[in-house]
Amino acid sequence: MSRADTIFALSTPMGKSGVAVIRVSGHDALKSMQLLGVKEPVRSRVATCKTLYDKKRQPIDQAVVLYFPGPGSFTGEDVVELQVHGSLAVIRLLFEELQTVFRIAEPGEFSLRAFLNGKIDLTRAEGIADLVNSETEAQLRQAFAQSSGFLERLYEEWRSSLVDILSDLEAYIDFPDDVSPQILRSVHDRVKELHNSLERHLDDGHRGERLRHGMRVAILGKPNVGKSTLFNHLARRDMAIVSEYPGTTRDVLEAHVDIGGYPFIVVDTAGIRESTDFVEREGIMRAKSEAATADIRIMLFPHSEAGNLGVHEAIEGGDDGKTIYVLSKADSAKEGETRIIEGKQFYLVSVHTNLGVDSLLSALKERAIDGFPKSGDVLITSQRHRGHLQSAAKVISDITDEMPAEIVAEYLRLATKEIGKVTGAVYGDDILDNIFKRFCIGK
């Protein structure tokens, strides 16, 4: 893969559609017009209608053509965009012509070039990928903020502060007779202030990452209490087998759902009971594992046994506030009805009649509002960011007042490097490959 190549790709999903967009980027991007039989000059930043031809001068399609000369384009290179009809035949014929001169882009290569040409940093690039992959409104809001530079500005501010502190310290090291010794006190004070800012940022309860991936909700209970029925209802499709025979569900099933604009991963689990069946026991172990790691637990109990539930025994290790209690199969319940049993609030739910389901969904949304970022929050969104920021915080926390100035300077260089890895001010090819390979081909 050479940066000198001119590349092209379909930037819209493959398939029949009203419009398809083909993007060409590189030094020779404008040659795509000559290649496709367009003889008139194409004006920059003006949408023009052109007929595109194959090498035999047979018309392929009429296209809206846009030309963005570099560096004032997304990639920082000359870019041509062809908006054509979303016909598989049109796309295939245009690809056949373009491929005689240009190379098909690798996944994420347009965004990679934008990064390498200084148009975006790595946090913005990752925000763009998250924006493309967002499925709920809350995910979209977070991804848009990141792609707009919220994280970039914060992390660059920290990195710049470290560079300034390091500059003052190195001036003291190189010219001790000309620089006041008070500079050392100032260095340590500023380092501690920056460390406090880093720690506050890291102490976010992983809310940004949870929003990016979805809040995990485990549906738990004994066999035949309606777990799979509720799971299918929340998933809006029949994913789990529903049977009157206990032990039907023996594995973990997952469904990504949007509840009130927030992303959830709803998990169906095996009924928890004593069993001699090896496969069922494995399913029960997985159910207990989900119970231990889920962000939210929905614990189902049959409405018919409301007088003798054994709530406290049902949750191994005690209740940690993550559990929503449900009396299932409550066909005669009233909408929104709840009941206090053994000191716990229970939602009465009947999937069969749909009673109580809205109240349960509202309870899940309330948990999401508490567990996800608030509007305007600037939070860590990936483990890659968190790892480098934790490393920077650890290095800074190891600095002591008694350390020689030269050692402090080395620690500050390491911390600066770690924060630079988040934004891409410091990077290696392996980091870039790992980030951009997750992008779609046309982005």
Curated annotation (Swiss-Prot):
PROSITE patterns in alphabetical order: G_TRME (PS51709)
Residue intervals of the TrmE-type G domain: 214-369
Domain of life, per lineage: Bacteria
Binding site for (6S)-5-formyl-5,6,7,8-tetrahydrofolate: R23, E81, K119, K443
Needed co-factor(s): K(+)
GO molecular function ontology, one term from the record: GTPase activity
Membrane-spanning parts: none
Cofactor-binding details, from the entry: Binds 1 potassium ion per subunit.
Predominant place of localization: cytoplasm
Compartments, record wording: Cytoplasm
Residues where Mg(2+) binds: S228, T249
Protein's UniProt keywords contain Magnesium: yes
GO terms under cellular component: cytoplasm
Keywords: Cytoplasm, GTP-binding, Hydrolase, Magnesium, Metal-binding, Nucleotide-binding, Potassium, tRNA processing
Enzyme class, first EC level, given as a word: hydrolase
Function: Exhibits a very high intrinsic GTPase hydrolysis rate. Involved in the addition of a carboxymethylaminomethyl (cmnm) group at the wobble position (U34) of certain tRNAs, forming tRNA-cmnm(5)s(2)U34.
HAMAP family found in the cross-reference section: GTPase_MnmE (MF_00379)
Entry-linked PANTHER family: TRNA MODIFICATION GTPASE GTPBP3, TRNA MODIFICATION GTPASE GTPBP3, MITOCHONDRIAL
Subunit organization: Homodimer. Heterotetramer of two MnmE and two MnmG subunits.
Protein name, entry field: tRNA modification GTPase MnmE
Organism for this UniProt entry: Anaplasma marginale (strain St. Maries)
